[in-house]
Each structure stands twice: as C-alpha cells, then as structure tokens.
UniProtKB/Swiss-Prot annotation:
Gene this protein is translated from: guaA
Binding site for ATP: S226, G227, G228, V229, D230, S231, S232
Record's protein name: GMP synthase [glutamine-hydrolyzing]
Ranges of residues in domain GMPS ATP-PPase: 199-388
Enzyme class, spelled out: ligase
Enzyme nomenclature, EC number: 6.3.5.2
Highest taxon above the source species: Bacteria
Residue ranges annotated for the Glutamine amidotransferase type-1 domain, each copy included: 7-198
Upper taxonomic lineage: Bacteria, Bacillati, Bacillota, Clostridia, Eubacteriales
Matches recorded under NCBIfam families: guaA_Cterm (TIGR00884), guaA_Nterm (TIGR00888), PRK00074.1 (NF000848)
One Pfam family per UniProt: tRNA_Me_trans
Pathway stated in the Swiss-Prot or TrEMBL entry: Purine metabolism; GMP biosynthesis; GMP from XMP (L-Gln route): step 1/1
Species name: Symbiobacterium thermophilum (strain DSM 24528 / JCM 14929 / IAM 14863 / T)
The keyword Ligase is assigned to this record: yes
Amino acid sequence: MSQQRDLIVVVDFGGQYSHLIARRVREAQVYCEIWPFTAPVQRYREAGVKGIIFSGGPASVEQADAPRIDPAIYELGIPILGICYGMQLMALQLGGEVRRGQQGEYGRATLRLADAEHPLLRGLGRESLVWMSHFDSVTRVPSGFRVLGATENTAVAVMGDDARRLYGVQFHPEVVHTAQGREILRNFLFNIAGCRGDWTTESFITRQVEEIRRQVGSGRVLCALSGGVDSSVAAVLVHKAVGDQLTCIFVDHGLMRKGEPEQVVRTFRDHFHIHLVHVDASERFLSKLRGVTDPEQKRKIIGNEFIRLFEDEARKLGQIDFLVQGTVYPDVIESGTETARVIKSHHNVGGLPEDMRFQLIEPFRQLFKDEVRAVGRALGVPEEIVGRHPFPGPGLGVRVLGEVTPEKLEILREADRIFVEEIRKAGLYDELWQAFTVLPDVRSVGVMGDERTYAYPVVLRAVTSEDAMTADFYRLPWDLLERIASRIVNEVPHVNRVVYDVTSKPPGTIEWE
C-alpha cells in the first residue's frame, strides 16, 4: 500500500484564480484540491490536510452576503495562507480591522519586506514586484500577528502569526506578474506546512493502478474511447491496471473530424493491442439530433445515447461492471460547485442518465489537462495523440450551431482540416491550446465570379490556455489568416465568408456551444 500523500486545500471564495493556485501547488509536486468555503471543518481534520490556502474573491468582506468560512478552521492547527480576500477575511474573523480604501490598488507594486529571512519570504530579498487587485485593505492586524511586508499604498501587504502558522498576503502570488510568487507559495508548502513534494507523475500512476485494481477486482471494464487525449490515456492506464479485463468501445457517432475514426482504430488495435470494438452509430446519433437546435439539449442527447449504446454493447459482451471516462478537473469545476454557477453541462459529467447501469472509473477526475498529457507520455502514448488539441465529447455536434445535418458536418470537416493543416505548416500547433472551426446557423450574401451567393460563414477559433479555465485568443499572423480564408472559400463548397473569433475566456467560453 502506498504512503498517504500530502494534501493542500484551496478554499474557493469565488476568485478567478482559484484553479491557478491549485496548479501552482501541483507544479511544486504537492497534491492540491479546490474545496468550497462551505465544506465542514471536520472534513479537513478527517482528510489529514497539511495546509490550507484561502483564495481571493470578488466580494467585500464587509458585505452582509460575503462568503464566510467557519472560524473553527483557525483552531485546527493546520497552517493557513490567505490571499487577497482570503487575507482580509482571516484578519476580520480573528479580530483585526478591514476598511474600504480611498482608492483601489491594481497592477504591479513594490513589496518591501520587514523580515526578509522569515520562512514565508525567504529568498525574496528586501524588495519584490507583486501583483495587486484590491479595494479593501487590512488596517489593523489581529492579536498575535505582525506586519511582514508593505507597499506604498498598502500598509499591511503581508501579515503572519508564527505561533498559529496563520499568514496572509494582499497580493496574488499565483499569477506570473508577481515576480517571486512561486517562491512564496513554495515557502508556504515546504517551510510552513512541511510538505514532502511527493506528487509526481510516477506516484500518480502507481497510486491509480492500485486504486483501479482494488475498485475493479475481477470485474470487467468498458472504456469510452474517443481518440482524444483524456480517453486515450485513460484507456492505456486502465489497461496497465487490469489488462484483458478491459474492452474499449470506439463509437463513431458521425460527429468526428476528417479521418479520425480510421486513425483511432489503427492506433489502438495495432499499437496498443487493446481489445477494441468499433461501432458505427452515426445514423443513430444523427436521427436523434434531427430538428434539435438547443445546445444543452444536444449535449444531453449525445451523452444519453453514448450510455445507451454502451449498455447495448455490454449485453453483447456479457457481464460488464465498470465504465471508464476521461473526465478531467476543469470538467468537474465548470459543471458546478457551491461557489460557481453551472456554465454548461459537460459531456463527461452532467449528461449522464440517472439510471446508468455502470459504476464509473474516472482516473483523471482530479487532474488538469497538462497533467494528463504527462501521464500519457510516461505511459508511452504516442505524441500524435498526447499532443492533440482537446476535442469536446459531443464532437462536431457542438461546433455545428443549430440543427446538425450531414451537409453541415461535411462543410465543417473540410474547413477544419484546412485550418489545422495550415496551423501545423506554420509551426503553431503546439503553441495553441485549441484551433478549430465553427459553423454558425446563418448564411450571408457573397459574390463568387459574377454570381451572387448565399452561403455559410465559417468561424476560426484559436486560443492559448494552461488548463481551459481561462483562455486568450491567439494573434494569428495576417498573412496566415488570409491564406486560410482563401483556401476555405475556394476549396469548401457552400462557404463564402471566413471570420476570426477574437474573444477570450472570460467573457466567452472556448467552445461556442
């Protein structure tokens, strides 16, 4: 049995950077989870939490409806680091004073340390650039605390109570704009909380193989294989754990990209030698989607049909007990927690029928996408799969806006093939989180030759991201955009216009539906 790993908990107060804090902790090879602020204090004790980080948040601590945590958390003896709102809440709940400032402090500021040798601040020097984003400020620290650092406009930028191991920083150490932010977080993890740094790809694989074997026993397992990164790596990991007890089912739902079904079958049958059942269910899915335009309804239909189909295949195979899914942490977070509204139902999370007959195996439920890729590389999954851009479970069904038809799918496949081909030629594919095309449910007037046309526009979408929780649109070179647009309107029938989506996330999502 493997040793229990260290656990750091990020308490989510609705801050936009909560997931980023968790990523920074994991980058230091310490396991981290995001919990809602409403989690009972007893849960921390039972989980053996090594350290707690309070996230920032959009509220003012003085608001009546501002998120609060049970003050009993300070009596657990577990080290706590409060960030921005988290520091203000800590100060207020422990008897300090927080006031609305005359002016906010946003952007870079110079932090001046009162104690550069303090375990939390070791290695920073006397001054360091930090990133501020606040209006409220701590004006008096609680009893037992001392001021460890200040900026020109913030008298209490760092505070600490060494006896109780309670600390707060008014700035955001998790963002890249704070020059030595990662050092501060590492100091908290290792100098204050005493973490070992035992969260590695290899330790994850070892632990998951043990857990999967224990969960499955002598049972039989089905894997929902799409050919994407998550399901592919999940299949290889589960196969490592249970071998021939695993059967992979690859469903061609008619919503795949060009040439994708053939590539998936070749890769997993020939390269991995995994038992693979290939089901061509395109007619079944497209008939169910006929006339459906609402994106949420499309996602639910596709999710339901997947499970029903697996149940059909399970009956053919005999007794099947478990279903593997490549659900990742952002899927779980985006599908709703107590501090975040549901943005959209994720195919791997919210689209499952209530009467599902399988027990789920979700080995990557607590991993970010880059961590899944690292697991894949360690397991020997080919780079052409590990390095692939994320593809939604419902496939092109949520990239064809409105009703999904065979004609629209063919248009989108050809446009997408050209776009990705040109992105690869330009050497940009690996720089991007995703690059894909969208077919809106509208037509526009155009002129081709001497004739008026009334055809579809195609939307190009290319974004950079670390984990899909936030994303920036990519500034593609103009000459590349021009070449892509020219090829699409000339080579793809029924398209007369190409547009480029320059929306980041937030306010938009990466996918259009």
